[in-house]
């Protein structure tokens, strides 16, 4: 997006994008342990944002790694109990209770699940060397 502020910290209707994601998981299962993985350099900033925007969702914060794989691995290491694990990109705040319910039910039934949302094709008008997006 080209912002100086990382996407997960942008405000969406008075709350950070990451906070909105956390709130959906907490509402789905208040006993769930949420683990937030962030670059080490962003952890204190996140804690400040939690205080400023009243992010009261209980969660554990761990340092990420060099690559996404390393960050997921660090998050997995922070898990203290056995159970089904959901890995969610916190900059995707439009996760719904239904998505979580379907994902967890499928994982319980088959051992794993990968939720997805169908992509929407865009309509473009090409005029010589340029193109523009058309309203649907």
Feature roles, as predicted:
Residues 31-35, 58-59, 111:
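Short active-site oxyanion
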Residues 51-84:
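Short phosphate-binding loop-to-helix
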Residues 95-136:
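Conserved core of the sugar-phosphate nucleotidyltransferase
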Residues 44-49:
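Acidic helix N-cap motif at the loop->helix transition within catalytic regions
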Residues 1-43:
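N-terminal glycine-rich phosphate-binding loop and ensuing alpha1 helix
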Residues 36, 87, 112-115:
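Structural beta-sheet core signal
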Residues 19, 69-73, 97:
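Glycine-rich phosphate-binding loop at the start of an alpha helix
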Residues 9, 18, 75, 88-89, ...:
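Residue-level signal for inorganic ion chemistry
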């Amino acid at each position: 997006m080209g912002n100086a502020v990382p996407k997960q910290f942008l405000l969406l209707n008075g709350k950070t994008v990451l906070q909105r994601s956390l709130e959906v998981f907490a509402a789905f299962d208040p006993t769930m342990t949420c683990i937030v993985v962030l670059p080490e350099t962003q952890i204190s900033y996140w804690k400040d944002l939690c205080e400023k925007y009243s992010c009261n969702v209980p969660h554990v914060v761990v340092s990420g790694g060099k690559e996404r794989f390393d960050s997921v691995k660090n998050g997995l290491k922070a898990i203290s109990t056995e159970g089904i694990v959901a890995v969610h990109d916190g900059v995707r705040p439009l996760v719904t209770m239904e998505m979580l319910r379907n994902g967890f039910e499928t994982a319980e039934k088959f051992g794993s699940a990968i939720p997805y949302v169908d992509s929407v094709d865009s309509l473009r008008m090409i005029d010589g060397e340029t193109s523009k997006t058309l309203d649907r």
